[in-house]
């Protein structure tokens, strides 16, 4: 299919990727070996679509190859601390062809991989170190109806200080009375003993690692949570420029990079000022979460005319139920495709699909009758919507699907 980019020419079966894992983890906290088939087969057991279930299960013994259709969302956070070295290696071992670093900056303007500029309180061990004294808002225990909280930002500390911290699972207990209670351990369905001290990464280090793993890059320029310019001359444009300059400095071909942002101004800045990266700029479109938003083919056509090729809405913007309760492409999905835009979507394997509070499945909630129904969602996204890639918190499941049902094991 045209939207599946096969890395087979430069890749090996996943068993070889596991050997890469072993080599790259020498001297690093040991991570549990991952099996890309196990999770997919577990989910297939509760998949209502029997034809799809049997087809997926028939592929269990096949070779599995990396694919750009499988995009690692922050690494592999269903089992590893997000944006950790260990999580990135696990994602590559699961066949993710593209790996994400969410990019923000430290007090001394070093670019680092964090989902948010101010998430260190829950995604690192900073509250358990002397650096807690530098946090924007120190730990405050739960008190009556007031939940426990803390705010620690990358801009509170230097790069050298950032590198002393551990990456930890982004789980917290808002009823906690102490820091130890606040930093709740991860309960993972895929890793028996989740890491408690993963290795934090700078953006440059992530480039070096992902390049060594033979994968592509999708850095997201995170919205600053400080006033810009943060220092004289370091305005939003300089920040956006610095992200791309780190790929040039590392000698990475622009064709391997998919820079992303929720801020359309960042996208137009890249398109207008960095033509070598323009074709693969990805706009993360969250407009569908606004009350009353209505998409239109004319709007999508105008975006493409301005130079946008790839749009990346969340899954609920692409899915709907028809009159008989079947999952089908949404109006948004049909319009975007008819306007000629390519689509990437997020985030697969994020949260319980049967939880009514999980907004990722809100438009199709009544159809989500089992955990395995996620595979039906993936099937619709791949075949009916025609997305070119899916972000996943456990990319092995998407890799398995792509190898089994999208022709990866056939010669081109």
Can you annotate each of these PLM segments?
Residues 3-5, 20, 34:
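Coiled-coil-like amphipathic alpha-helices with heptad-repeat character
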Residues 27-412:
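Phosphate-group recognition and catalysis centered on beta-loop-alpha active-site segments
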Residues 3-14:
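Bacterial N-terminal signal peptides that target proteins for export
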Residues 13-23:
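Bacterial N-terminal signal peptides
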């Amino acid at each position: 299919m045209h939207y599946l980019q096969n890395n087979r020419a430069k890749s090996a079966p996943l068993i070889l990727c596991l050997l890469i894992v072993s080599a790259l983890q020498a001297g690093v906290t040991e991570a549990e070996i991952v099996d890309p088939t196990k999770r997919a087969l577990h989910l297939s057991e509760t998949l209502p679509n029997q034809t799809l279930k049997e087809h997926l299960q028939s592929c269990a013994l096949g070779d599995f190859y990396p694919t750009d259709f499988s995009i690692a969302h922050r690494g592999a956070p269903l089992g590893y601390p997000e944006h950790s070295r260990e999580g990135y290696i696990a994602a590559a071992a699961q066949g993710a062809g593209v790996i994400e670093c969410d990019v923000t900056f430290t007090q001394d303007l070093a670019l680092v991989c964090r989902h948010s500029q101010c998430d260190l309180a829950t995604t690192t061990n900073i509250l358990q170190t002397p650096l807690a004294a530098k946090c924007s808002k120190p730990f405050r225990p739960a008190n009556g109806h007031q939940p426990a909280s803390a705010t620690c930002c990358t801009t509170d500390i230097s790069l050298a200080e950032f590198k002393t911290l551990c990456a930890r699972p982004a789980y917290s207990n808002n009823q906690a009375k102490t820091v130890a209670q606040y930093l709740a351990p991860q309960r993972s369905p895929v890793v028996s003993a989740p890491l408690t001290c993963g290795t934090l990464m700078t953006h440059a280090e992530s480039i070096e690692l992902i390049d060594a793993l033979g994968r592509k890059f999708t850095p997201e320029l995170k919205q600053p949570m400080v006033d810009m310019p943060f220092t004289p001359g370091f305005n939003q444009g300089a920040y956006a420029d610095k992200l791309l300059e780190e790929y040039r400095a590392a000698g990475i071909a622009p064709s391997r990079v998919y820079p992303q942002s929720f801020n359309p101004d960042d996208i137009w800045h890249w398109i207008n000022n960095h033509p070598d990266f323009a074709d693969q700029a990805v706009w993360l479109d969250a407009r569908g979460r606004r009350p009353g938003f209505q998409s239109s083919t004319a709007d999508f056509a105008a975006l493409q005319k301005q130079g946008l090729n790839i749009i990346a809405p969340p899954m609920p913007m692409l899915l709907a139920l028809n009159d008989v309760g079947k999952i089908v492409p949404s109006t948004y999905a049909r319009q975007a495709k008819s306007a000629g835009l390519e689509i990437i979507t997020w985030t697969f394997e994020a949260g319980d699909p049967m939880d009514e509070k999980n907004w990722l499945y809100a438009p199709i909630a009544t159809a989500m009758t089992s955990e395995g129904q996620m595979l039906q969602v993936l099937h619709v996204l791949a075949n009916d919507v025609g997305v070119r890639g899916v972000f996943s918190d456990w990319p092995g499941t998407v890799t398995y699907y792509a190898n089994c049902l999208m022709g990866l094991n056939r010669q081109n």
